[in-house]
Structure formats: C-alpha cells, structure tokens
C-alpha cells in the first residue's frame, strides 16, 4: 500500500510541476499593452520558448537571409512529428501561416505566436490539430525586419516601430515567387516543394482607403485556379470564415481596390494575381491560399486580434474539410500530370469584365481637397461611418489565351533559367546528343518590371 501511495504522490508532484502559468507565456506584444512588436531575436527566443514548453512544436530554419540571419519556422503536429513523410502517412493536411514577408506589416507574426501558444502550450484548442499540421514562419524577411523604425509605414496606426518592406538587397519578396532572385525566396521554394501545403495564409497590412472592416482579403477565385478548387474556396472556405468573423463583429470584405483610386464611387475592381505574388504562386501549384490584409488605420491591437481570429477559424474549417480539400487537390494534380491542360485554351492574361453587381461597402464619409503641395485632388476622410452602395466588378475574363506546347526547349547557356526550374520542382530531361527538332519560338516585344 505504501508503494502505491508513494507512486501516486510522485505522479501528483510531476503533474503540479508541469502546470503552465499563462503569465509566463505572454508575448512581447501583450506585455507592451498591445502597442509593440518584438525584434528578430525576441521573436526567435519566444518561438524556442514555445518549443521547449510543448512536445508537439518543433523549431527549425528553412535557410538564411542575404545578411546571414536564419529564417525560422515552427512545425506544429499533435504527434510531435517534424518530417513531412510521417505527417502525410497519417493523412493530415498541412497549413502554412507566414508573416513578415513585408516586415512593416507584422500583424501575423504576433497573432501567430499567440495562437500557437494557445493551441500547443495552453491546450485551449487541441481540436485544431486533429487533421491539420501547421507550419508557421514568423519572419519571412529577417533583414527587412531588422531595419526597424517608427516611420517605415508612416500612414499605419502601429505598432510603435516596425520593419521595412524589402530585404537587404532591396528586393520585394512578394514579387519574387517566380524569378526567385532573393536567397530568402530560394529557401522558401525548397521548403514549399518539400511540404506542399494544401493551404497558405499570407499575412499583410493594407494601404489606402478608410473603411469599417478590420481586415480585407484576396483569394484566387476569378479564373486562374482550377474550377473545383475555386468552387471550394468560394463556397466552402469563404462562406464559412466570413460568417464566423461577422459573428465576432470582425466583418471581412474583398481587398478594396477602387477602379479610380481617388473616386470611391467609381466602384471596386477584382483581379487575378500573377504567380510573382504568394496567392498567385499557390494557385499555379494547384494549392489554395488566402491573402490577409488588415486595415492600416485600425489600431494594432484590433488588427492583430482580427488576424488571430481569422487564422483560428481557418484552422477550424481545415479540420472539417481536410478530406474534401485533400481529394480535390489530388485530383487536380493528377489531371495536370496527365496533361489535361494541353487539351484546352490556357488563359495567360485576364481583364475585368464590364458586368458588375451592387454591393454595400461599410465605408467612411470623405471630402475631396486640393493639395497645397501638388495642386492635385486628395481624399480626406472624416471618420464618420457611411454605407456606400457601389458597383463591384467581380468578374474576370481571359484577355489572351494560348495552346500550351508539349514541351519547352531551354538552351544550356540559360543556366539561370535551369536553376529556376529546379527551384520550382519542374520536371525536365536533358538531351544527351545533338538532334533536330521543329519548334515554334516566342519573341518578347516589350518587357516591363514591377
């Protein structure tokens, strides 16, 4: 009897020692009264603290920045697995959450660290890992992140200081997904090829207009994604998260891009993203992605918690829809591999259709003033809320289409192109002898940079 008593007592002591004090895991953001975001070292240290506190979190790095800083990534899996093969064997889907590709917009970093703490350390939402494993990149662009200052986003309402838009080479990483000039992007592409996440959430803060919504979103649902995956994003994902966010008094709205920038009454445009952008690149790989754009004029606390809730609700749906999403993507991948795209016209550019619908934009009243500096017009928002009934041009139609060739031939002197093919995991073979092949060739008449 005494032996049993001692054993029970020891178990009780062990249990007490493992009890988590929530205050010990407050983030820098929370400790600052929701006004500040941590620097690189503080962010990495906190991520390692979470790893030490939870057996289901693994800390790793995906590569280095141009200046040699590690790009951190957390792997969160209910079994503590850190290898993609083992996670895939269990049938889990993989969700990638990334922040600070534009380090002046750090909302997703602070939201992500709080959410992963609540899931894996405080055990508030263990159900979010039932059928989903999470990858979290808190700082995609470490060098840009450490170009820290209070004036990097002069029209943004917090945090007190933030990083810079580009990396140390002055490259905008969210325009680099195809050309992959930056070492950060080359590392990211290798990670993406290894994990191939079914869903990516890319966290940003927007520029521009004033309105009620704490966040807006972009999703590739206008023609450049396979139709079944498009239907899932529109009818399953967006319908679910928009309803949930509305109930939380955090309404969502499509990314606001006025047809004429200085005239909100001109209506709203939709668009398809090029593959140089994250959501466009995910679409080109037959994967779903969401662009999160919190509203720059909202205070930092509001923006971070709106991001937190959207990330959480996204994970709820991913667990509900894991098999469905996995099956849709598997079928699309299979059709792509079989060459189904070669049988039909392939759109290479889109334009906005003239058709529109009337939507209610929860906006703000404004006046048009003459600028003393430029003499041009500028919009001055009054801060008073107003519902605007305006047209939303929500249809995109192909501007140019083409028949995809059976293959492309890349001359060996274009070694940079060949390296890029490797980075994008594009399969190709090398000719081992001279041969004559009848081909069609393209000539680029006009090139421009963005």
Label each region the model flagged.
Residues 4-13:
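Sec-dependent N-terminal signal peptides
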Residues 16-450:
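Structured catalytic-domain cores with a bias toward divalent-metal coordination
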């Amino acid at each position: 009897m005494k032996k049993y008593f001692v054993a029970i007592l020891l178990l009780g002591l062990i249990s007490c020692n493992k009890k988590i004090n929530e205050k010990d895991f407050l983030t820098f953001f929370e400790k600052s009264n929701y006004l500040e975001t941590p620097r690189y070292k503080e962010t990495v240290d906190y991520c390692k603290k979470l790893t030490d506190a939870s057996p289901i979190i693994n800390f790793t790095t995906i590569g280095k920045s141009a200046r040699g800083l590690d790009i951190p990534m957390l792997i969160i899996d209910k079994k503590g697995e850190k290898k993609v093969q083992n996670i895939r064997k269990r049938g889990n889907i993989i969700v990638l959450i990334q922040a600070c590709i534009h380090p002046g917009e750090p909302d997703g970093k602070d939201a992500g660290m709080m959410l992963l703490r609540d899931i894996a350390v405080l055990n508030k939402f263990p159900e979010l890992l039932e059928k989903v494993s999470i990858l979290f990149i808190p700082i995609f662009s470490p060098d840009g992140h450490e170009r820290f200052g209070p004036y990097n986003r002069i029209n943004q309402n917090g945090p007190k200081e933030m990083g810079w838009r580009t990396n140390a080479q002055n490259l905008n990483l969210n325009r680099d997904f195809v050309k992959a000039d930056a070492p950060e992007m080359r590392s990211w592409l290798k990670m993406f090829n290894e994990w191939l996440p079914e869903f990516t959430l890319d966290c940003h803060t927007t520029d521009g207009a004033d309105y009620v919504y704490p966040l807006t979103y972009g999703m590739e649902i206008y023609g450049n994604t396979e139709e079944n995956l498009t239907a899932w994003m529109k009818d399953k994902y967006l319908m679910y998260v928009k309803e949930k966010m509305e109930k939380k008094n955090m309404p969502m709205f499509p990314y606001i891009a006025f047809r004429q920038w200085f005239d909100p009454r001109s209506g709203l445009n939709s668009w398809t993203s090029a593959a140089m952008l994250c959501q466009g690149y995910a679409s080109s790989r037959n994967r779903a992605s969401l662009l999160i754009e919190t509203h720059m004029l909202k205070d930092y606390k509001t923006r971070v918690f709106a991001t937190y809730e959207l990330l959480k609700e996204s994970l709820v749906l991913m667990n509900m829809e894991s098999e469905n999403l996995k099956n849709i993507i598997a079928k699309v991948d299979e059709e792509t591999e079989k060459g189904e795209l070669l049988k039909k016209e392939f759109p290479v550019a889109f334009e906005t259709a003239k058709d529109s619908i009337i939507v209610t934009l929860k906006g703000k009243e404004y006046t048009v003033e003459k600028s003393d500096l430029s003499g041009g017009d500028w919009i001055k928002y009054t801060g008073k809320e107003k519902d605007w009934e305006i047209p939303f041009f929500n249809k995109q139609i192909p501007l140019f289409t083409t028949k995809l060739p059976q293959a492309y031939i890349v001359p060996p002197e274009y070694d940079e192109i060949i390296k890029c093919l490797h980075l994008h995991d594009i399969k190709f073979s090398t000719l081992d002898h001279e041969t004559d092949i009848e081909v069609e060739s393209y000539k680029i008449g006009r090139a421009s940079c963005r």
